[in-house]
Structure formats: structure tokens, C-alpha cells
Design a protein with these regions (language model features):
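Carboxylate-rich, polar loop motifs that coordinate divalent cations or form catalytic acidic clusters
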Residues: 1-348
Length: 348
């Protein structure tokens, strides 16, 4: 009789333990996707760009104007004959610099908008493909279509050229990505087996310039490059994904993602979320690479089941949220369920 009771108790404990482990496993991978589309007030459900300002307002660049989202309501800025605050309705890129200042590249050119100050500037010469980015002091730079690096001068309200020392200008068609890291070094990733590091000098003078600091060699041609802070994610000619940290310049092999690109098409963006990675595709959704160091394969793959192309993606600046801009389904807000471990006290 005692043996039977003991076995029942042990069996009960084992079942509870298995149930607890199952709940932990399920919840550790649980996530929520909230969709925001034209039913919620978006002017258009194709999201070309995503940004966020210092007040944590979300900025969605659509095919029909800029949409500013405060978590509840959406305010729309679009170009109309009676309102030329923003020229052009295809919002291709959004960058925030000074408080309240938005830089918006559209199909018509580059707009500077500060609605609080009533300041609206327009630079039609920067329409088309170019690279727009900021340094650690939030000053705006642009690498234009003819290979010129320029910085916006807040005093003159004009762009001025940044000279390039110890290097020839790099053709825009060869560049995959440009960024400043947290040490204000300028990194340029190109299509061949090299990437460059420049230092910036005399920024606040009439003759700013960059000087080539280092040329780094990669063992294969680079085909894609995506910046996320001090991390750069590069994809080589064989669709192998690597991560480079500018803090401790070393190349980390992530995974062979060739089967993903064959299945889902070209990559549109890559971002780091905690220790995991999000990869979006121009024709078919987003996958999450979850770090699993205890397994043979360091990353497991979760498909977020977004069945359309993804044009833009960013990590929230203050919360554990990923904002996903799609081609036709609006914006998805990704959040994770916090899992809890319950403790049980067993008595015999």
C-alpha cells in the first residue's frame, strides 16, 4: 500500500514537472503580433520606411504620406496642392536628428521638417538613390549619386562637402551600406571583398574631411550589408550570414541562409533583438533566428507567418518591440510574452 502511494506521488510529481517544462518551452517562444493598417487610420498599407523620434512617436513612411503614431491615434502628413509641408508622397526614408526635426526622403527629394518651429526645407537634388545617415551628435550626412559626402550645416541651413583624404571617392553603385559607429568612425561596406573605416575631422569648420583609417579584407564578395548600431550584418556570395562588431572588430559566422533566400527572396533588413536576429524579406515575411548555444546549430528559426513582402523594420528605441513595415498589410508590432516559472511544494 505504501509503495503504491509513493509511486502515485512520484508519478504526480513527474507529470507536474513535465507540464511546467512544457509551459516554459512554449512561453519562451511565445510572441504577439498586432497589425496596424488602414482600418486603424493609416493613409496607406504599404510601409516603405519606419522611424521613431525622441518622444517615442512612431513614424511610418507610406506610399501616401507620413503617418505619425502615438500608440492610439495616427496623424497624417501628405503632399497636396494646398499643403506642401512635405514634397512627395512616397516616403522612402525617415531620420530624426534634433528634437522635433524629421528628415524625410521622398520620390521628389529630401525634406527637412520641424512642425514645432514651422521649419520646412526642401532639397530636390537628393531625389533618387543615396545614403542618408547620422553621426553620434545627430548631424545629418548624405552620400549622393556622384560620390560626394556632404554634411548639413545647421547655421547656414545648407549642405557642405566633406573632403575625402587618402582615398578615392567610392562609386555609389559599389556601396552596400554606410554608417557611423559609437566612436564616430565612418564605415563603408562595398560589393567586393573589402570594407573601409574612415575618421572624421574638422566637422564644425568650413573644411570638414574624412581620412582613410583602415581597409579590412573579407574572404568572399559581400552582396548585402545591414547596420544595427555597432553591429553590421553582411551576407556573402554564397548567402552565408556574418555579424561584425565595430567595438571589437571580429567577424562572427551566424548561419547559411541560402535556403531562406531561395524560399523567401531578397533580404530587406536584419536587426538584432536581445541575443536573437530578425531577418525580413522583400517578398515573403520575417523569420526570427533564436540563439540556442546549447545545441549543435547555434540558432533555431521561427517563421512569424507574415505572408507578404516586408519593406522596412526597426527595433523600438525604448521597449522590447520590433516594428515591421509590410508591402500591403500595414505595420506589425512584435512583442514577446514574458514567461513565468511557478514553484511547487510537494509533500509526501
Amino acid at each position: 500500500m505504501l509503495h503504491s502511494i509513493t509511486m502515485k506521488t512520484l508519478t504526480y510529481k513527474f507529470i507536474i514537472l513535465l507540464f511546467s517544462l512544457l509551459c516554459y518551452t512554449l512561453n519562451s517562444n511565445a510572441y504577439n503580433l498586432r497589425q496596424i493598417n488602414n482600418k486603424d487610420g493609416l493613409s496607406n498599407s504599404s510601409i516603405l520606411s519606419v522611424g521613431q523620434d525622441e518622444n517615442h512617436l512612431m513614424l511610418f513612411g507610406t506610399c501616401d504620406g507620413l503617418n505619425i503614431f502615438d500608440g492610439k491615434d495616427i496623424q497624417i502628413f501628405r503632399s497636396t496642392p494646398s499643403n506642401q509641408a512635405i514634397k512627395g508622397n512616397f516616403i522612402e526614408k525617415i531620420i530624426t536628428t534634433q528634437p522635433g526635426t524629421y528628415w524625410i526622403r521622398t520620390n521628389s527629394g529630401l525634406n527637412k521638417m520641424n512642425s514645432q518651429k514651422g521649419e520646412f526645407l526642401f532639397f530636390p537634388e537628393f531625389a533618387g538613390h543615396n545614403f542618408i545617415f547620422t553621426d553620434c551628435q545627430h548631424d545629418l550626412f548624405i552620400y549622393d549619386g556622384i560620390g560626394n559626402l556632404q554634411i548639413f550645416n545647421e547655421k547656414t541651413k545648407q549642405f557642405q562637402s566633406v573632403l575625402i583624404h587618402k582615398s578615392e571617392p567610392i562609386p555609389l553603385s559599389d556601396i552596400l551600406d554606410i554608417k557611423f559607429d559609437s566612436q564616430n568612425r565612418l564605415w563603408v561596406y562595398v560589393k567586393n571583398e573589402m570594407y573601409y573605416c574612415f575618421s572624421l575631422y574638422n566637422k564644425n569648420t568650413n573644411q570638414p574631411y574624412i581620412e582613410l583609417h583602415e581597409v579590412k579584407h573579407f574572404n568572399k564578395n559581400i552582396t548585402k550589408a545591414f547596420a544595427d548600431g555597432d553591429y553590421e550584418f553582411i551576407v556573402d556570395q554564397d548567402d552565408i550570414l556574418y555579424m561584425i562588431s565595430s567595438e571589437a572588430p571580429q567577424i562572427t559566422h551566424i548561419a547559411d541562409i541560402s535556403w531562406l533566400t531561395h524560399q523567401k527572396g531578397d533580404i530587406s533588413s536584419i536587426i538584432k533583438y536581445k541575443e536573437d536576429l530578425f531577418i525580413s524579406f522583400q517578398t515573403e515575411g520575417v523569420v526570427k533566428l533564436t540563439l540556442t548555444p546549447e545545441k549543435k546549430e547555434p540558432y533555431s528559426i521561427i517563421d512569424l507567418q507574415i505572408h507578404c513582402g516586408v519593406l522596412s523594420m526597426m527595433k523600438d528605441k525604448s521597449q522590447n518591440i520590433v516594428w515591421i513595415g509590410t508591402d500591403g498589410q500595414g505595420v506589425y508590432k512584435y512583442t514577446e510574452e514574458e514567461y513565468t516559472l511557478n514553484s511547487y511544494l510537494f509533500s509526501q
